[in-house]
Amino acid sequence: MTISTLSSSYGNAQDVPAEDSDRHGSIEPGSEKAANAVERSGIPILEVKNLCHRYPHLDANTLEEINLKVYKGERVAVLGANGAGKSTLFKHLNGILKPLSGEVLVKGEKITKKNVRMCRETVGIVFQDPDDQVLAPSVEEDIAFGPINMGLSSEEVEKRVKEALKMVGLEGFEERAPHHLSGGQKKLVAIAGILAMRPEVIVLDEPTAGLDPLSSARFLELIMKMNKELGITLLLSTHDVDVVPYFAERVFVLHHGKLEADGIPEEIFSDPELLRKAHLRLPRIAEIFEMLQQEGVDINIKITAEKARDEILRVMDSRFQTFRMG
């Protein structure tokens, strides 16, 4: 099916209800700017103030007085055990859910009924289960859905679909039926659908869940590329602590709907008690270093393989020098 046929099938954005046309999240052009060093000053691209949320069937709040800021170009991990409130928080970031109290600001503007479409054109969301998001009969139709409903020309829609497919490595999949794809491939289609709308922020809910180690690594490489080459601000939720050191510049820790910590990965993972309180653990590499500390070895906890190597070499050199002097 051609893009022009797709356009006539879907109609214009003005003819489609907001809740339908925004099912992918959305975007505003601007992703062509190269990623620059993040400056945590000025107006945050996302800000959450005193956010509380409660589902109707529950007696307690799912989110309790959440306050956080995310700045343009950052890569942020939201770390928490299952049930910590990560998905609920993410659904507030472009107005899918409404707060019980508090507010969410996108580029300094509070999300309201009047501007929710603009907010969804800035913040795109990739859901944990791609079957909740990839719904069209073909890959091409699914990726074209958002751009068509932005009112773009057939030529521009086709261009964006091709660019998005190339970015996620699915060239040649245009006519494939999504239900014939693997789980990992469906997640890539979901991301392509968001990329085609060129958002400034992409929120990914447990993106590596259900993926094998190789697919998970490739997925992380892709989203790092999106950040570095397109300048897209990224928020990623996960309970996989081994993923975080290789992705995040900053980490939020959620526990029972409360924000327990906000810091760089080295700070967060140097506090084992914080992680245990949040029903998490140290990354495997850091666990080894913690055990060495408990054995009396004078060694600093490291969280990536490269830094662990450097620290081990430092300790070995120090002991060698001590041995020579003795």
From Swiss-Prot:
Stretch forming the signal peptide: none
Keyword Membrane: yes
SMART domains: AAA
Keyword Translocase applies: yes
GO terms classed as biological process: cobalt ion transport
Keywords: ATP-binding, Cell membrane, Membrane, Nucleotide-binding, Translocase, Transport
Matches recorded under PROSITE patterns: ABC_TRANSPORTER_1, ABC_TRANSPORTER_2
Comp. bias regions, Polar residues: 1-12
Main location (coarse class): membrane
Class of this enzyme: translocase
Domain of life the protein comes from: Archaea
Cell compartments where the protein resides: Cell membrane
CDD domains listed in its UniProt record: ABC_cobalt_CbiO_domain1
GO MF term (any one): ATP hydrolysis activity
Segments forming domain ABC transporter: 46-281
Disordered, as annotated region: 1-34
Enzyme Commission number, as recorded: 7.-.-.-
GO CC entries: ATP-binding cassette (ABC) transporter complex
Membrane topology: Peripheral membrane protein
Task performed by this protein: Probably part of an ABC transporter complex. Responsible for energy coupling to the transport system.
Family of the protein in this entry: Belongs to the ABC transporter superfamily.
Protein name (database record): Putative ABC transporter ATP-binding protein MA_4020
